[in-house]
Amino acid sequence: MTAADLRSILATSLSGLLGTYTDTDGSTYPAIYVGNPPSSWTATGLECRIGIVPDMDQTPAYVTGAITETHRVRLVSHGAPTNTLTALRKVLSRWPTAQAREIPPNEGLGILAQHTITIPT
């Protein structure tokens, strides 16, 4: 599964929960992006960012190792986090072996409330 494939699946699964990106000319887009969105865009509501390149891990095995790939997804809450938990539940029900981690907000550091999800390919 590529990052583009994952984006397509998540866009469908999270339809109605995603916030919006607004660019400099006022155009709006669903707040889901592979990589980092342009710095000139602003996000409102729930934002979903998908890593461009999957992480790889090698599990030692007899003679050869098994390589597993995972995609890292970040759900960022711009405002009330109500959609975040609903979105997290949808993603985890779609990929039962995925792992989620909460990153608590920190106003002093400018960190918004968010969850990172590691999804196996």
Where are these regions (language model features)?
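Small/flexible residues
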Residues: 9, 51, 74-76, 91, ...
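Oligomerization/assembly interface segments of phage tail-like spikes and tubes
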Residues: 64-79, 109-121
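Short, low-complexity, polar/charged sequence segments that are solvent-exposed and flexible
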Residues: 53, 68-72, 92-94
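Small/polar-rich, solvent-exposed N-terminal microdomains that initiate assembly or binding
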Residues: 1-63, 81-83, 106-108
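Exposed beta-strand and adjacent loop surfaces of beta-rich binding modules
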Residues: 11, 70-72, 85
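Generic alpha-helical hydrophobic packing signal
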Residues: 16-17, 70, 87-90
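Polar/charged side chains located within well-ordered beta-strands of beta-rich proteins
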Residues: 7, 47, 69-71, 102, ...
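Acidic-leaning, charged glycine-interspersed low-complexity segments
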Residues: 85-121
